Amino acid sequence: MSFFKNQLIHRARPGYRIIPESTVTEDIELGTIGEETPLLSEGVITAVEEGAIGLPEVAIGVAGAIGTHAHEWWRDRYAFKSVLTGNYTDLKGNPLKPRNAIPEKIKQLGKKIFQGDFNRAFPDNLKLETEKEKADLLRYYNHNRRLAGLSEAYPQGKGYAYAKSQKVLEAERRGLTVPGYKYLGPGNSLNRGQPINQIDEDAKEHDEAYDKVKTSQEVSRADNTFVNKALDHVVNAINFKETPGNAFGAAIGAIGIGTKQAIEKYSGVIYPSVSGMSRHINPRYINQPNWKDYIAEGNSKNWVGYSNLPDDFFQEETLSDSPMQEATKRKADSPAVETPAKKGTTGVNVNSQSTDPQNPSSSGATTDLDVTMAMSLPGTGSGTSSGGGNTQGQDVYIIPRPFSNFGKKLSTYTKSHKFMIFGLANNVIGPTGTGTTAVNRLLTTCLAEIPWQKLPLYMNQSEFDLLPPGSRVVECNVKVIFRTNRIAFETSSTVTKQATLNQISNVQTAIGLNKLGWGINRAFTAFQSDQPMIPTATTAPKYEPVTGDTGYRGMIADYYGADSTNDTAFGNAGNYPHHQVSSFTFLQNYYCMYQQTNQGTGGWPCLAEHLQQFDSKTVNNQCLIDVTYKPKMGLIKSPLNYKIIGQPTVKGTISVGDNLVNMRGAVVTNPPEATQNVAESTHNLTRNFPADLFNIYSDIEKSQVLHKGPWGHENPQIQPSVHIGIQAVPALTTGALLINSSPLNSWTDSMGYIDVMSSCTVMEAQPTHFPFSTEANTNPGNTIYRINLTPNSLTSAFNGLYGNGATLGNV
């Protein structure tokens, strides 16, 4: 690559206005910053200089581009002149006025103050010796701020530091594009936003294919695919099936690829610089001891101020015609090269990507760190190898290590349920209390529970049974859509009740009531005989099958039906699968506040503070709840085992340097706050798991029960509850309620209809480290242990966690 072409390509980086990185940039008026400047194709420059193609081929490509975007080319004609001549002007051709140079003292002061971050405000309270120094520092600040393109490219506070860390500026500057497009052109970044049109989308796919190729055959395949798509666009435009814009871009793209292929007939396949792939230092110089210190010094300065380097010092990565990667080939001995002592330095820039070993510029490059490490190994000195040949100048050959990537499979289970809920009235129920005895009291509500902590809401029995050991829920989501409500009234009753259609009805929603500890979910078993909206008796919530007169066939049978093979209930009348036929069924459990008499608590807390209420007439067919939860320990199948190896197999006592806090429990006794105690209890970890811990009805979140690894902290949590309800609607009567101060105890039959979209994501993996193991296995750190406690989620929470107290019986 000649000096002329090297400098022209360096200047022809598209993106923001081109200002060379030298002291001159601080002595000129910058003009407009942030406008895109289309420039000449690097491929065309190379072809013309080296004579790889003839003038007709060049003329076709250039003429096509000029004909399509003549306006843009004419508008930016002064930009081309600036690049080719080095005399920089603005977009109107006006010369950039010289300014007084900023003193070196101010530059060094600015570097210390701003440290490359010009997104911060200019510190007006700086105390300098003279006002001129402060003015010069402000010029330094404004220049670098404008040069970074902050005001145009990052107006939302994403300044220079952010852009530099994300390599945004480099991505926007990289490559060449046809004016009006983002990806149609060689060597572009893959992160330039949404394509302009379909041919621009095809060009992006072409660049993405380039990013993954490893052989020249794959390059040709990507080129041919793009050309075929481009020709299709042209044909479709002729037949009026597409807009002319696609045809223009397609013609330019096809001509460009054709020109590239013509060049490659003589030069071979040239790997384009896409997605961060750029030039690197030739390994033959890296491997020379007398170049090592010189290269390290150049890398530290990003090669600013270095010139007169050999023409092949920086090289583009080229592809082999063989599928074998370049890094695995052994090259012939390299001829002697000049040492850095024979080279001089001037102030001309050499723009090269960093060769920092932490961020290598290409997979085929070898850094000085790699060479140092390789030469320090026994038997790999700089002398002759075991075969007698000189290994100096060769790439390091790394032998691939065996590795099995078992991966993780993510499966998503989604169900759509239809439920009916009732506008139940508030009622205090419980036995009559006498004297100082603590008596249970429940205050019923209309809030029906969405059982999203249970697996049947997301999957049927077969889907659950087919999951392998170690499967766990990583995310679950429910969306609750309120469809409408129905208010019933009697039309043939006596004159004591009036029929009307304009009653007000409210919808209530709540998330996380279980964490309050104010109440529990209950299933209602009896209602007042003349008022069906008033519950009078409750029992424990129903999820699994419950026998008896007030039983329940369970969520699985309710939603998905019975097994036709061996389930005796399959043929029973009414036992049809509601989910399978998209039919309405009922939510079984409702939230009740819980209190005991004679405990000194002072009445019922304000539940309304934690409710969201809507006018039901305004939210028909609206999604009122959309909540997502990521379990901390969502294991739903038996955990993977580990295989104990090493001597001794019985490990004995291991010092872990800390208490095993995960094995502790808190015993909370004596409800009155004056005498309440919280004492510590210790429990051993075990690998013994109860049969019901991993059945389909167990809670998804198990971080209170299970622990990952033999020691360490777990910080358990519980899944927040989800409730929705229709507030009870009073019945209109002629009774003298106001005169006699009678309680409002007459309610209209009301019902609501909701749709529940439930979705959960399950992760599964089946790794093994042993060649003859018959089951998946893992290491001790990923092994799941159980704490010998059984929290009861049917009780109320204390400080955000469940205790192991007994379930409340029938009340």
From Swiss-Prot:
Comp. bias (Polar residues): 346-366
Compartments it resides in: Virion
Gene Ontology molecular-function annotations: phospholipase A2 activity; structural molecule activity
GO biological process entries: arachidonate secretion; clathrin-dependent endocytosis of virus by host cell; phospholipid metabolic process; symbiont entry into host cell via permeabilization of host membrane; virion attachment to host cell
Chief location bin: virion
Annotated function: Capsid protein self-assembles to form an icosahedral capsid with a T=1 symmetry, about 22 nm in diameter, and consisting of 60 copies of size variants of the capsid proteins, which differ in the N-terminushe capsid encapsulates the genomic ssDNA. Capsid proteins are responsible for the attachment to host cell receptors. This attachment induces virion internalization predominantly through clathrin-dependent endocytosis.
GO cellular component: T=1 icosahedral viral capsid
Record's protein name: Capsid protein VP1
Region of interest (Disordered), residue spans: 321-367
Organism: Galleria mellonella densovirus (GmDNV)
Comment field on protein domains: The N-terminus of VP1 is sequestered within the mature capsid. It contains a phospholipase A2-like region and putative nuclear localization signals.
Tagged with keyword tRNA processing: no
Domain of life assignment: Viruses
Gene3D superfamilies: Phospholipase A2 domain
